[in-house]
């Protein structure tokens, strides 16, 4: 199981998750995408949420899948899951134990299960648990996606420090947009220096699909 988080929201988790799953499936690794918790959605009028995109991809493997099979807590409010849950369904806190069991059931059918979190690692799910706690409970490997803008160095290093302190098996990958030429002069020079000293180098996502698939499966 691979848990995908990010330096923050809008870093490109969903795009990267889909690309990695498509690559894995093309390589013969049967892969499913799950979005157990999603906020800021209105399923009655909008069918382009993260989970809807995942469902579209997943149904290439299993036409019987529905949205409820891959996304279990869905809220209108675009906020941390805890806040959305307390406002919209205050008597039904998110049960990460139940989620863990449901997500692990997919490992019986698929070679690789990719679980996308909401926001970053410290986003609260309950009063006691955040996304990092959830990933630890799942015993999943971690792929942390970084944006490619100015400031990514600080964001990557903070997340690297946090993940290292919890002794997770993790990789950090930069979601590099094709038109971001500034990255090569502004951020890449330090990333290259960091990688020379680190036993867990930061990679560029688009250039590392084979490596990331191998990491997820080993």
Swiss-Prot record:
GO terms (molecular function) for this protein are: ATP binding; dethiobiotin synthase activity; magnesium ion binding
Per the Swiss-Prot or TrEMBL record, the active site comprises 35
Q: Which cofactor does it need?
A: Mg(2+)
Q: Spell out the HAMAP family in the cross-references.
A: BioD
Gene3D superfamilies associated with the record: P-loop containing nucleotide triphosphate hydrolases (3.40.50.300)
InterPro entries reported for this sequence: DTB_synth_BioD, P-loop_NTPase
Q: What Enzyme Commission number(s) does the record list for this chain?
A: 6.3.3.3
**UniProt keyword annotation of Transmembrane helix present:** no
Q: Which GO terms describe its biological process?
A: biotin biosynthetic process
* Coiled-coil positions: none
Q: In its UniProt entry, what is this protein called?
A: ATP-dependent dethiobiotin synthetase BioD
Please give an example of a GO cellular component term from this record: cytosol
According to its UniProt record, which protein family does this protein belong to? Belongs to the dethiobiotin synthetase family.
In this chain, ATP is annotated as bound at 10-15, 116-119, 176-177
Q: Which of UniProt's keywords are assigned here? A: ATP-binding, Biotin biosynthesis, Cytoplasm, Ligase, Magnesium, Metal-binding, Nucleotide-binding
What job does this protein perform?
Answer: Catalyzes a mechanistically unusual reaction, the ATP-dependent insertion of CO2 between the N7 and N8 nitrogen atoms of 7,8-diaminopelargonic acid (DAPA, also called 7,8-diammoniononanoate) to form a ureido ring.
In which compartments does the protein localize?
Cytoplasm
Report disulfide bridges, numbered on this chain: none
The positions annotated for binding Mg(2+) are 14, 116
Q: Where does substrate bind?
A: 39
């Amino acid at each position: 199981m691979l848990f995908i988080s990010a330096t923050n929201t809008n870093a490109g988790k969903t795009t990267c998750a889909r690309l990695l799953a498509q690559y894995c499936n093309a390589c013969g690794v049967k892969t499913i995408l799950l979005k157990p918790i999603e906020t800021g959605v209105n399923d009655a009028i909008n069918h382009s949420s993260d989970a809807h995109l995942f469902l579209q991809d997943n149904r290439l493997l299993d036409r019987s899948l529905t949205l409820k099979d891959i996304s279990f807590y869905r809220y209108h409010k675009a906020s941390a899951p805890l806040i959305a849950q307390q406002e919209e369904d205050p008597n039904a806190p998110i049960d990460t134990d139940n989620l863990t069991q449901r997500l692990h059931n997919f490992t019986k059918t698929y070679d690789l299960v990719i679980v996308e979190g909401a926001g970053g690692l410290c986003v609260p799910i309950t009063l006691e648990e955040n996304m990092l706690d959830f990933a630890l409970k799942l015993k999943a490997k971690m792929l942390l996606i970084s944006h490619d803008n100015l400031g990514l160095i600080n964001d990557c290093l903070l997340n690297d420090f946090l993940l290292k302190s919890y002794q997770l098996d993790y990789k950090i990958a930069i979601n590099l947009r094709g038109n971001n030429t500034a990255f090569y002069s502004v951020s890449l020079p330090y990333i290259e220096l960091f990688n020379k000293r680190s036993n867990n180098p930061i990679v560029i996502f688009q250039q590392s699909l084979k490596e990331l698939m191998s990491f997820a499966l080993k």
